[in-house]
Amino acid sequence: MKIGIIGAGAAGLTAAYDLLNSGHQVIVYEAAPFIAGQASTIPVGGFPLERGYHHLFTNDTAILDLMDELGVGDKMQWYPSNVGTHTEGTTYKTTTPVDLLRFGALPLKDRIKLGLFALKVKRIKDWRTLESQTADFWLRERLGGAAYEKVWAPLLKGKFGDHYDEIGMPWFWSKIQTRFASRRGLRRREMLGYPDGSFDTIFETLHNKIISAGGQVHLSQSVVKIETSDGQATGLTSETQSGEKVFEAFDCVLSTTPSFVFSHLVDLPDDYRKRLDDVHYLGAVVLILEMSQPLTSYYWMNIADADVPFLGLIEHTNMLPKEWYGGNSILYLTNYLDRTDPVYQMSQDELLEYYLPHLTKFNPEFDRSWIKNVHYNALSAAQPIIGTNYSDHIPDFRTPIKRLYLANTTQIYPEDRGTNYSVRMGREMADMIAADQKNSWKYWN
């Protein structure tokens, strides 16, 4: 069987790898000039660094198993996380449960309440019982008070903006499950994974395995149309860098594009198209600062302060060696935004000027002379907004067009989007496609 895959991110490459190992022909098309999507890298100080911050959790079994299979499992290293929370102009250490008891932004009873509440959520086994509630409503009703208003409410608003009160409670539940599962030791300190050589270690190896198995990966080649005949996918028309349109026939097609991209590539029935269009995506803007010294002592900073105009402050080299990056400290400043938001529209220089005055809130001694270099990245489909009762509305992997499949971050549920889940989904798609062929495509008959 000859299979066309749109997108060379984690899901597309993993599906291609498995399908090739099952004896199929595979061609992958990628609009960007690089592989790995949101896990792709740029050179910083002579070493690859992800365009957006990346790490793994100890329960990210899909990608860890893939690394073992690729022969690079020994490259994964585990580091203790170091977490701060910035609220009302002050930064507090919140790495361990003991730190939470010392969290001076809350009265003692609310600190205890906050910790016990997280344990309560962790013990919920069936996320389906939460589907009818938004995270905002559920947390207000069951946590409430200062513990909600000073911690979770600002974090929800920071991440989802005006959409904070639309997010289904299963999203919050899955976050709690992941964070607890990655804690080790008596002090329950979170351990985070990062591969030696960056995430390139995983995806360059995966890419090389695909090529060695006879697969093809066409970079800088956008698919402009999914061709169909009598309700069945028959091939792809792509556009090369030179503007040439190229048609390639396929027995089936897997698209890993965002829903709003996919819906423009092929005519779809109204009900399925509505499922795609009903999910709103937030974009993201990321600044990476190469600095002569660290801004804080933390790897991860939760920002629960409406006066700070960015959502995340991640100091990569507070967990990983700065020697990898020419001795500089690496700081990510990240934000999720509607694509119509004026901040999303800002240039690199405008965004830097907008953010800089706020860095002294985290370190009064900060001076812009610390900044040696700046990198900018924008993503149009960084975070889907998943609302209540989403299992009733999630788009099927098998589209109404015969032999045409869709797999993207709107279909990772109840978990939030993430590299591990994209790998898992890619493997599931390869299994599904192979099984459907074996069963003579009966799903569509």
Annotated model-derived regions:
Residues G387-N445:
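C-terminal lid/capping helical subdomain adjacent to the catalytic/cofactor pocket in oxidative enzymes
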